[in-house]
């Protein structure tokens, strides 16, 4: 366990560096995620956001640095290693099997079995009951049966199913990669509500988005990357403006703006 571990830290990434060939994607980036916290991870295209979360989710290796989960140093070889440590990633396309029901998608690959288990029969009734509870917990107010195929759901509802799956399997950290992209206004507000409900249920989130307005509505703290480096941390959206953060993202100094 790292000597300066804080008990409220879920994840700590220290001095993460990553090269793609000769191109440096990340340069000594350090971040922490605390319990019951929604982090907004912002930056322009090429800033390093996607690379950072792929490293944290076990999807790509890194060249140097350290990752700690609850103070324990880890080395993820693949995404299953990250999931086993309580890190679940929800991508823009939700990674759901549209032909299967909501309940089957929630438990996909981790289906409960009927007793005796030697027959390997899935307990569909148990899955339906738990999926119904989860839909209400994330904030879906419509009466959608858990047997409904995912193909019948809207984009926002599909994101809710993915969030529900992460919540059910006790993920400490849910990484949301562009969860509101290509969604309408009403669906976007629904997804933001689902994210808040996840935090209120004891989960932390990293929220990656290009739309700063969405980020400001839901996060507790903002981290900004630029050209592979962390340029801002501990930004409180209640104490800062969207314009302030935009200037940090683009590299325009606030003192220069004041002189104009």
Regions from the PLM with identified roles:
Residues 2-260:
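Glycine-rich phosphate-binding loops of nucleotide-dependent enzymes
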